[in-house]
Each structure stands twice: as structure tokens, then as C-alpha cells.
Amino acid sequence: MSNRDSANPPGFNDAVPLAICYIDSSTSSHDEYLTLLQSKVSAPDKNFRDETVDGAPFLAGDAISKGHRYSPPVRSDRASAQGLLQQHLEKSSTLENLKRYSSTLLGRQNDAVIDEPFAPFRPPPRVTLSESRRDRWLQGLSDPMVPLSSLIKTIPHGLWGEDILRMLVKFRVPFTRAIWFIRCAGVNEARSFLRKVQTTDITEWVKNWTDVAAGFLISFISSFLNADIYSFADDYTYLLKLFGRLLAEELVSPKHFLLRIVSFSGDSSLKSFSLHFFALQFFSTSLIQYTHICRKCVITILQSYQQLIVDQPANLLKFSLLSKKVSHFLFTLAQKNIESFFFPTEWDKLKPTIILLWKDFPNYSTLLSIMQERNSKAMYMYKPVTSSIRFLQIISCLSFPVGWRTLAKDLFKLLPVYTGVPLLLHWCINCRSIFSGDRNFIVSSIFDNANFDRNLIVDLTLSFVLKLHPLEYNECVAAAQLLDHLAACGYFFFSKYIARLASLGYLRESMLNSSFMDDQRKILVQLPILRMSQQLKNKIYYILSKGNYFVDWSICDEYVKRFKEDHFSFMFKKEENYAIITLSLVKIASTPMSKLYEDYLVMLFAFHYSMFQVMTKLIADNLVHFSFQSCACQTLFFICSVVPKTESQKLLLNEMGKLFQVELNFSYDSPDVNLLIEQFYEITSYESNYDDAFVEYKDATVANRKDFIEFLFHNITVSSKHTAVIFTSDLLMVLKIALNHPPYFDDLATTTFSSLLKRDECTILSFFKILQFYGCKLLSVDQIWAVVSDVYEAQDNNTTLKQFFNYLLDESTWPEGYLEERHWRSILCKEARKHDSGLKLFKLGIKLCTRNEQIMKTIWSFIHVHDCNVISEVIPDQRFLRTLTEHFMIDLRQLDIVTCLKKALVTLDEFSAPLYATWLTTLDDDELSELTDDVVQKKVLESLDNYKSGIWKLVLSGLPNCKTVFEHLLLFSLEERLDLPAAFLQDLIGASAYVMEQVPDSWFLEKLPCPLTQSLQSFSHLSNHIEVLDSTRQSRLTFLCHLILHMHGFVELTDQLATLESLTIRKCIYRNQELLDLLLFSIHLVKPNVETNDEVCNTLKAWENIESRPYTIDFPEALQQYSPRIVLYEPTFW
């Protein structure tokens, strides 16, 4: 015992412990302190005998006679060092040093290798039990009051894989005890696996177990349709929580498990999607950690949601609730990991769905703009098409409503303004297309939202017009419509046009009869002169008179008279002058209308001839006395007021605005359906438009809406009155909107459509009924294809289908008039180009129809802008495809193959080149034998003197040796001293992408690294002291970066990283943000990813943790020798 009365050693209270001195010192190093601590590790905590202090008293005689006792270091055993330490800890330098020392200590502790526990781990044994004893054991496991120490002796053998998970769900074992059981069984299985395969790597075993566990969860979700909803919900919740614990305890491979769950694709039902989405939402915390899995999750959710929208689930309330959850989940995911929304190849398809889901979030546009920027930058890199073709595909396949500002930004990123605007104008007047009703509107809308100077667009348009020669009639009319529309929008001035002709000297007497002026007169004679000054009219008349061009304006009065006599069958004469059409419509619009349908037809004609903007301008200038509201409304229905006065008018305005690509947003409450029908009767004056049977039915009380709608569909089927078909279809459309798209509507529409196709013959009236169905949004392109394919498979002769396709593809067989049906037919053909089902519909139509001249023109118009692969898919008959291309491209038959190729490379445009490539695919090997790799490469290089951007790639895409030619050109372009055009280098990027998609040849990959490295080093040397890169060098660097991006997945290109990184610090590079982004993106993708060993898959540590303790590495250093295996645990767990 210590003597409490003895005094402290002299000077004890003044002494300061060594550790405190070091902590308090502002000059001491924490490394010195750690060295000191390491030197004292072996020193015991207490010295029971200190020779320097307690040795002297043993020598004294008093100690011999009375005995020795040690001097206590403190006055009392209850003494505290608090006061001694507190005065030092209050100093700021002391706290700062303590923080540094502690951080260093903990860091070294984590890096230290911890010795294995003194006792080797022995997994608990398993015994073979009968089924009844096994069930009793599992019941004991599920009872928290049964200690695990009693269960560990009789762990049942044979429970593993899906069986162990099924039993845990069945007996509702608490999660901590369930994890213990899985560990006990799993560690035995793992050791058995290691003994069996004679290895120490358990990676394969962990992945197999993860695959089985994930498969059990997926099969459980798939079994929902045959399960009780309440028991299934409990089991599903338990199972998700159990898998959450398995992930947290590292008993499954996280990446492998999450990838399996994300990749699961059940049926397209609402229930299956809900369960799958709930699982993804539950594991979202783990998903966010792996960007590539998270990206796949986003794509899976969006694609499944798109399919749900197409299938139109019956329970709209549940679908609405699920949509809110999906939108919130994706929005949160984008905020936490925006990299998961980087999927350039899928962006175009999934972007509309993202906008639909996020439209209610107030700040989603900022997030969407970031995604749009990243995906659009990388989009063309992954798609092997030229910028010009990509440009044309975007504007040819627009789906309304359109985000015009984003569209304009994307388009002019693909092509500069000096190239993009002429191509846009060329697309607008392309005479081969029959779908030109809204092209002028698209062009002006893009101009309105592009950040370009208006004078620049005027100059580019003027230059484009002066280069138009020679022109066909349709192109002249289209050009006149375009110029008239742009003039009304302020993007063209006829006075500047005439002044430019005068400044170029073409208005001199000697030049007025030149071939150039003959081409210009073809356009001038079509121009309306209503809004021109008298001086300008006189100049145009003078120019026209020199070429013997005259316009007979008296024809306009004859057209007005014919319209008043029979507006249903009224049509303008084929190849009528556009100026006469414009003046005739203005005169018709200026006379009072006796029927609302006449107003409607005037609006329809205005849309058909792209005169909406012109008509509005004329009304505003008081040049036409016409209902301004009716014109400004721009709808296809019988509404004469922009401000809707009834619920039916609101519905009609909102729906029909889509037809003219005008967004008319009106807020309205759900109307009373019976009242809506009454208002519709008042608008349409049904007594004179409907059959007698319908009038009688209308007077009856509409007690059952479904019966009433069934009667309307039946009335369309049997009706022989054209007006009855029109107005009944319109009423069905209104009811569909008012009743919130009831599910039986689509069934009735498809059944009616099918009955029309299954008749003995398809009359023109039956075909018009189908067009009315499509125009009134009762049928979609997908539904039309589904019905047509079913009828085609069910019938043998398909006579009705042949008549249907002949009417669809050959408008010349129609009777005069029927402008509304002609309009719906052109809209249907245009929409079919955008859908896979639409392409399949045309493919079947081309197979069944009669191939006359008019049908061949329609097919020729339909396949424009598509690449040769799509064209070959739509028209698989190679003989007919060759006949079609040679019929419209006469030069193909008159020249030898090499001369024809040479001419195609310098004369074809973006519209004709894919068709030439399609023709090449129809030739046999003998005909192509002269087009060897060397010959084709030589002809391409010869065309550089008269280079047309992107044309050579489109032309060569039809050759069987296209990839090989591209590879030769890529290697040729890497030579150091070549001065290639900038546009050609840009086009080589598309060739590189094509080679990447087709998988490059081995000989090309062997030759590529050396010239690529030399080209990069040469570029680095040349740009060392340059302040600003010219266009050629920018194009070369862009090409080199894209070549690396495309090929790094096939060949090792890490040797180029050093050169790429050195370029990022050059002034001429980092001042160019676009080039810098491209370089950094290239470096990021090419830099090798260092694969870290996955501890979950490589070690049994998580499985041997039977006591469910934290890892020893997480304990403080003082507790590392603590062994929990020899400690008794609380009885609530064991």
C-alpha cells in the first residue's frame, strides 16, 4: 500500500510531463514526437521499483531495522492531473499541435499492418438435420430470445443460395441474426470452394453468390402477378431491407449486384415497372457511387417509362403518382451525379421524356442545358454521319412542340452559319419532297431563335437566291413561297433583291436576256406583289417582259367563283402560278363566308401554301378584309375567335393548335360531357351535316357514354356521307380529350380501322375515313402499323391492303378537291419517317402497291435524307431499288463506273449523295471490280480541288470496301507535310467514327500508332510559339483528338498522352475553349484506369466476422490487441 501521508518528491509539482512539453511547443516537430513514442512502446505502464529513486533507502540502517516502503509519486491516490493539463490545453498552439499529432497518429495507425489474432479462425460446424428439425431451428433463429450460442452448435447443412434467402423470408428472421446465419453458412461454402478449386482467390465464388442472390430478387419481382398483394408487399419490403444489409456488410459484390438489378427488364406493365423502380430507388445510395451503373439505371428507367406512355396504362391515377416519384428520383439523381445523364447515343430519344418528367420543376432548365451541352458535344463523335446529314436529319424529323432556342443552338454547332443557313434554305425548297407544308415556318422559327444579326441572314438568303440555277417548276414555287414568307418575317427584302441584281449589272439591256436572268425570272414570276411598292412592281414587270413572262390576273376571279360554287371539291390547277394562288386566296378571304367550314378551308389552303405569316401581315396592313381572329388562331377547326367562349372551343383550340405547330395553352376545367356535345352541335350545325340516324340518336338522353361513343364509331363505319364522317370524327376527338383518354377509346378506334381494312375492297371513302381517324388523333402511326400487320398476316390475297397503299402512295387516283384529306395524308407520310413502325408501314406498302410513275415519285420523296442503310432496309428488293435510283438519276446509266464516281464526288449534294450510295449497294462484284481501294482513294483526293464538304463520305458509304478506303485515307492524312483543306480534315472525323463503328482492321491498328505520334509531335512543335491557331491547324488538332477518341478502345494509345497534356498549356490552345474541352475530354478517356482490388471479392474478412463486430482497423491503437472472440456477448444477440 502507498502512504497517503508522505509528501511528493521535491520539485514534483514544478515538473511538466514530457508529452505536454512536446504538445505545448510551437517549434517541435510531430515527427520527433512520434519517434519518441515509438522508442517507448516497449516500456511498461508502471515501474514497481525505480533504482534511481528507491535504491538509496535500502542501504540505510533504519530501512534494515524497520523495513522499506516506496515513496508514492502523489500525495493521494485520488489526486488528478486535470489542473496540470488544463493550463497547457488552453493555449491555441497546444490545441493546434494536438490536432496535428492526433491526425498523424491515426493515419499511421490505419496504414499499419495488423497482426492476425492469436487464435486461428474456425468456422462453426454444420450438421445434417431433418426437415422438421431444420424448421424448428429456423424458428429459434427468428426468435430474438433464443441465444445464438445454443444455435451455433446445430447450424443446418444444405441451406445456401436461393434456399437460404427463401427460408429467411419465410420465417422473417431479424436482420442481424439473418446476417449471422448467412455468414456462418457462407464461410463454410467459401472454404469448401477453395479446397475444391485449389486456389486462394474467392472472387469467382463471391460473384457466383452475388449472381444467385440478385437472381432471386429478380425472380421474386417477376412472380408478383401470381402473388397475393398484401403478403407480397411484406415479403418484398423484408427482402429489400435484407439485401440492403448484405450490401452494407459487404457480403455481396456491390457492382455486380447493382448491375444485375439495373439490367433487369420485366414486362412493360405498370406493376412490373413500379416494383423495379422501387428496388432501384431503395438502392439509390449505393447506385450513386458507381457512375456507369447509375447511367444505365437512368436509361433503363426512361426507356421503360417511354414504353408505358406508348401502352397508355389503364390506371391513370397510379401512373400519375408513379410519374411524380420517377421525376423526383431522376431530378435528385441528376443533382447528385450529373455524369449519369451523359449518354450521347441515346440523348435524342430520351431527352423529350426527361423534359416531360421535369416540366413541373422550376429550375430544371439549367440542369437540362448542362446535359444538352455535354451530350450534344459528344453526339456526332459517336454517330458516324456527316455534320450536314445530321443537320438535315434533325430538321426533317422534328416532333412538335419544339424547343426552338435549343434546336437553333444545336444546329449551328454542327455547321457554321455561313454553311448552315444555305443548307437550311436548300432543304426548304427541295422539290423532291412532298412534305413542305410547314418548312417555311420551321426556317423562320430557327432564325428567330438563333443569335445572329438579322442583316447577316438577309445577306445569306440573298446570296443563296442568286446562286439558284437551273430550277424546276416545283423549286421555283417553293423558292417564291419561302421568299414571301421570309419577307413577311423581316428576313428578306425584295427591294434589296432587285438592287443587288442592278449592282451586278444584270438589269442592263445586254444582260437581261442572259441565262442567269432566265433562272431569276422563273422565281420573279411566282412572287406575290400585294405588299410591294408601285416602283418595285414596275421594275419586276419590266424584267419579266424582257423574257416574255406575263401573269393573267383574271384567273383569280374565276377561282373565287369556283370556290363559292363548290368549296368541297375546290382545288387550284396543277402547276398554277403561286402569285395567282396568293391573290385568289386573298380575294376569297375578303368575301363574307356563309359557312364556318369555308373559313376553315381558307385556313387550310393558307397552311398548305405556307401563307399564314403572309395572310397575317396582309390583315395587319388592312389589305385583306378578313376575320383577323380566324387567321391568327391558325387552327384547323370551326373556331372563329381567338378567345374561346365555351369549354369545347378551348379543347378544340388546344388540340388543333398542334396541327399547325402552334402552342395554344388554355387553362380549363373538366367540362360536362353532355353540355360539351350540345355546344359542339351548335358549332357544327349538325342538322345539315349528319345522317338522319345520328340526328335521332342525338335527341335521346346520353346515359352511357361508352354506348354513345360506340355508336359514333359505328356511324363512321356505315356512313356514306362525307360531311358526316368529318364531323363525327371531330366530335370523337373532342370527347376523347374531355373524358381524359378513356382506355376503351383506342380499342374502338383500332377495331373500326380493322373492320374497314377487312372489307372486300377499300374504297376512297373508306380511305378518307382512315385519314380522318389519324387527323383527329384517334389513331397513331404505331396503331396503324399494328392493325395493318395483323390484317396482312391474317389474309391471303390482301386486296384491300393493296388498295389502301395505292391510295396512300398515289394521290393522283383521288377525285378533285378533298384538301383536308390531302393534308392529313402528307402529315401521315411525314410522321411515318420518324418512327420505326412508320418505316415498316412503308416497307409493306412498297411491297404491295402498284409501282407506277406517281408511286415511284412518292417513294423517291420518302427515302430522301435517310442514309443508304435505312433506304435498303425500307426497300429490300434490290432490283426495284436499282430501277428506282436509275430512273431519277439518269447519269448513272450513261457513264462508266469510274467516271460516274468522279462526277458524283464533285456534282452531287447532300440530298442526292445518299441515293447514289444506295445505287452502289445494288451493283454486283463484277460491276464494282474497277473501284479498287487505290482508285477510289485517288478520285477522292482529286476532288479536293473542287471540294464539297461531306459528299465523298456519303458517296463511298455504299461501297463494300468503304471501311478499307476510309482507313487508307486516315493513314494518308497523318503524314506531316500534307496541307489538306480544313473541311476535309473535319470530314475525316466522320470517317474515323465509321471505322470505329465497323471495328477497324488489324493491319490498320498496327500502322496507326507511329504516324499518329509523329503527327501529334509535329503539331506540338509547329504550335509552340503561335498565339492563335488558323482554321487548318484547328481542324487538324480536332481530327487528331477524335481519331484518338475513336481508336483508343482498339489499340494502346497512352504514348500520346504526354503530348496531349503538353498541348493544354499552350496559349493558342487554352484560349480556345472548344479545343481545350476536346483535349481534356480526350485525355480523360484515353488515360488508363487503375483497377483497385476489390476487398469484398478478394478476402473472406467480411464472412469470417461471425460476431458482427467492426473491423479491427477501425479501433484505436490501444484496442488492437483486444480479441472479441473470447468475450461474452450480450444475451439479446447470442
Curated annotation (Swiss-Prot):
A Gene Ontology annotation in the biological process aspect, one of them, is: negative regulation of cell-cell adhesion
- UniProt superkingdom: Eukaryota
Please provide the record's keywords in A-Z order.
Activator, Nucleus, Repressor, Transcription, Transcription regulation
Subcellular location per UniProt equals: Nucleus
- One Pfam family per UniProt: Med12
Primary location recorded for the protein, binned into one broad class: nucleus
Name the GO cellular-component terms.
mediator complex
MF annotations from Gene Ontology: transcription coactivator activity
Q: Which PANTHER family match?
A: MEDIATOR OF RNA POLYMERASE II TRANSCRIPTION SUBUNIT 12
Q: What does this protein do?
A: Component of the srb8-11 complex. The srb8-11 complex is a regulatory module of the Mediator complex which is itself involved in regulation of basal and activated RNA polymerase II-dependent transcription. The srb8-11 complex may be involved in the transcriptional repression of a subset of genes regulated by Mediator. It may inhibit the association of the Mediator complex with RNA polymerase II to form the holoenzyme complex.
What family does this chain come from, according to its entry?
Answer: Belongs to the Mediator complex subunit 12 family.
- Oligomer status and interactors: Component of the srb8-11 complex which consists of rb8, srb9(TRAP240), srb10 and srb11. The srb8-11 complex associates with the Mediator complex thereby blocking association with RNA polymerase II and leading to reduced transcriptional activation by Mediator.
Give the protein's recorded name: Mediator of RNA polymerase II transcription subunit 12
Lineage, top ranks: Eukaryota, Fungi, Dikarya, Ascomycota, Taphrinomycotina
The gene for this chain is srb8
